[in-house]
Amino acid sequence: MKTVNKIIGAILFVALNPLSAFSQTVSTDFENQETRNTELQISIVPYLGTNGKNSGITTNDFSFNLFGGYSAGTNKLEMASLFNINRLDAKYVQLAGIFNQVGGKVEGAQFAGIANANLDSIRGVQGAGIVNFTTGAVEGTQLAGITNFTSKSVRGFQGAGIVNFAGQELTGFQGAGIANFAGGNVKGTQAAGIVNFTPKDVQGVQVAGILNFARKVNGSQIGLFNYADSISGAPIGLLSIVKSGYHTLEIGTDEILPINLSFRTGTRSFYNMLFVGIRPEITDYTVWAFGYGIGTSPRLGRKTFLNIEASSQQLNRGNVEALNLINRFYVGADFQVARKVALFAGPSINFRVYDTSYNQHPDLFTYSGPKVFSERNYRFDDLASQFWWGFRAGIRFF
């Protein structure tokens, strides 16, 4: 991971520093010379100003540059319409129309129309229209239109339109339109439009539009897909995989289909269900169903758990031709009869919504005869609904 961070950092450094060759050459020229300090620098471009050829060995309290400025460092304020280049440290305010480049530490506020690039740490605020780049630690805030990058840790806030990257630990908040990456532990919140990723641990919350990935999570994950080795809270999403969590394969029956297969994954506090069912009949067509659900399973005793589940399944006769949705709320008991084997059973209340314009729906009850106690036809969209009490029972392996 450290090698990858160094490679990425090197690539970004070259890409983000159009005058890097210039600054490195000048730094070599001045590295053995003693720096001096002045209260004020006024320049048009590097070396064409009040400090002249001594620009690279002079730190300025104030520096005002018509197009661009170059100095050993800034102590209070630096401004330029295009760019500022500091060989060493910069504080407390640095403003540029295009980019700021600092070879040392930054303390205070650094704002640029396109990019900020620092070769050491920053303590304060960085704001750039496109990218903030630093090879040192960040303590404070980074705001960028596209990306924030640091090869070290972040303690504070990263907000980017596309990507945030912290090579080491994150303590605070990462918010990005597409992705957040932290190479070390995360203590706080990651929120992204697509993906949050850390190969280490999270103490807090990950929220993503598609994927959250972490090792050990002491908190929660909220996303379409979630992955963690272990998690103390609830992974909420379409599909959550917790390596040391709750995984079961179920063979069961209900009042509609005698054979159902279901897979549960997540944690007992919150899990997802994927299932299919079939009615084994010798006919010209097959009655089958597929569906999805969510549930929770609190412990009742040493070997007994409660199941509270909500699910929906599409019941079909051959191909999927029309809406025929069975929505089920189930409350049952799960009893551990052996290691990794459990029996379950319980009642359910069912709400069917179906398309009345289609007349080839399969019969609901072939092997049992529940009584439908409520039927209703809707005036719009050729829809109707039914209510009835049912059951579920079977065996689970995990």
Protein language model annotation of sequence segments:
Residues 233, 283-285, 317-320, 354-358:
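Outer-membrane beta-barrel proteins
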Residues 1-27:
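Bacterial Sec-dependent N-terminal signal peptides
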Residues 64, 113, 129, 145, ...:
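Membrane-embedded beta-strand positions of outer-membrane beta-barrel proteins
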Residues 58-60, 216-218, 253-259, 268, ...:
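Residues that define the transmembrane beta-barrel architecture of outer-membrane proteins
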Residues 105-107, 121-123, 137-139, 154, ...:
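Repeated loop/turn-to-beta-strand initiation elements of outer-membrane beta-barrel proteins
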Residues 229-232, 268, 334-398:
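Predominantly the C-terminal beta-signal and adjacent terminal strand-loop region
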Residues 64, 222-224, 238, 259-265, ...:
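Residues on the lipid-exposed face of transmembrane beta-strands in outer-membrane beta-barrel proteins
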Residues 66-70, 83-85, 99-101, 115-117, ...:
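Transmembrane beta-strands of outer-membrane beta-barrel pores
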